[in-house]
């Protein structure tokens, strides 16, 4: 059976020139994938006309949307006044089970607000959380929340850990993902009362909680999942992106300083390519909005074609694994157990 993914084609900084091409690439990679391209139909048709293929025509559907949620638009305006936006229609397709997942590079706040309104949260989950991948020396780790919730209570952090553990288990084929709680130290007495309380709850749970992790542990790959409040998580994410950008800048500067360094750079090209690839944000694009009654994946607003393709791939994998259903089932079991 085909995996169906709705694409907010008009969303993001670049819209249709990026989302459509990434979609065509995804269709060529995943033979059981069907895409709904949602956005301005004439513009989508024009873009698709650049990539004629008789074999792909039957594997995508164009759905017209007369409105677009702007990147600087308030979530309230997007929710109340733009009911025919490409974002809203793409999410509605998940609500009506026509699509198994949705991908958008649009406004994060609007995407979360519309997703919560249209799809609703899973019973037993107070608030959805955003989970993404972070590069490590061993490959990558997962982290949530990356910005959906500020000042989360201990119970919410445990919910994040539960949802994240299920998602990592079924998308990475890790039977019992290790979980760390982001803190300012590894000792039990370190951190705020909220963090210490969350640690106590996690220790008492059935999750594979291994203890506190510090900021410098994020990139060591010592755990499969790092749990934190959205405030700290978003800062860590942006700091990571900033450091990667700075390192690339310094390397360019160092290797173009004079003739000798330019010659050295020619010798070092293979190493530099591997280095750049390991930190390339395109490889880690596609953050999951966990806790909804449906799968929604958020792409970077400034995503290029390859980066948006990564987000589509994430949605495809989650849809195959039925992540939302598995989270719902586990939370339901826990609610029954606690009654």
Swiss-Prot record:
GO terms for molecular function: phosphate:acyl-[acyl carrier protein] acyltransferase activity. It is found in: Cytoplasm. It is an enzyme of class 2 (transferase). GO terms for biological process: fatty acid biosynthetic process; phospholipid biosynthetic process. Keywords: Cytoplasm, Lipid biosynthesis, Lipid metabolism, Phospholipid biosynthesis, Phospholipid metabolism, Transferase. It comes from the Bacteria. Its main location: cytoplasm. InterPro entries: FA_synthesis, Phospholipid_synth_PlsX-like. GO terms for cellular component: cytoplasm. Pathway: Lipid metabolism; phospholipid metabolism. Its EC number is 2.3.1.274. It catalyses: a fatty acyl-[ACP] + phosphate = an acyl phosphate + holo-[ACP]. Belongs to the PlsX family. Homodimer. Probably interacts with PlsY. Catalyzes the reversible formation of acyl-phosphate (acyl-PO(4)) from acyl-[acyl-carrier-protein] (acyl-ACP). This enzyme utilizes acyl-ACP as fatty acyl donor, but not acyl-CoA. This is Phosphate acyltransferase.
């Amino acid at each position: 059976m085909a995996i169906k993914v709705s694409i907010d084609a008009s969303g993001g900084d670049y819209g249709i020139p990026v989302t459509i091409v990434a979609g065509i690439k995804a269709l060529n990679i995943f033979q059981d994938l069907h895409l709904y391209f949602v956005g301005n139909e004439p513009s989508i048709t024009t873009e698709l006309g650049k990539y004629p293929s008789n074999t792909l025509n039957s594997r995508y559907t164009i759905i017209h949307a007369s409105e677009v949620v702007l990147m600087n638009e308030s979530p309230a305006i997007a929710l109340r006044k733009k009911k025919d936006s490409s974002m809203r229609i793409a999410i509605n397709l998940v609500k009506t089970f026509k699509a198994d997942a949705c991908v958008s590079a649009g406004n994060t706040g609007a995407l979360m607000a519309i997703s919560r309104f249209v799809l609703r949260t899973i019973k037993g989950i107070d608030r959805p959380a955003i989970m993404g991948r972070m590069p490590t020396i061993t490959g990558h780790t997962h982290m949530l929340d990356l910005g959906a919730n500020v000042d989360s209570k201990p119970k919410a952090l445990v919910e994040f850990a539960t949802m994240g553990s299920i998602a990592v288990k079924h998308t990475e084929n890790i039977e019992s993902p290790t979980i760390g709680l982001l803190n300012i130290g590894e000792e039990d007495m370190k951190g705020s009362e909220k963090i210490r309380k969350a640690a106590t709850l996690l220790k008492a749970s059935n999750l594979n909680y291994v203890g506190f992790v510090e900021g410098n542990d994020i990139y060591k790959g010592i755990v499969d999942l790092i749990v934190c409040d959205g405030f700290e998580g978003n800062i860590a994410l942006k700091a990571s992106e900033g450091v990667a950008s700075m390192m690339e800048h310094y390397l360019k500067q160092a290797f173009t300083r004079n003739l000798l360094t330019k010659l050295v750079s020619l010798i070092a090209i293979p190493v530099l390519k591997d280095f750049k690839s390991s930190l390339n944000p395109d490889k880690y694009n596609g953050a999951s909005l966990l806790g909804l009654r449906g799968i929604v994946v958020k792409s970077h607003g400034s995503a290029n074609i390859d980066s948006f393709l990564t987000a589509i791939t994430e949605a495809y994998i989650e849809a195959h694994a039925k992540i939302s259903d598995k989270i719902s089932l586990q939370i339901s079991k826990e609610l029954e157990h606690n009654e």
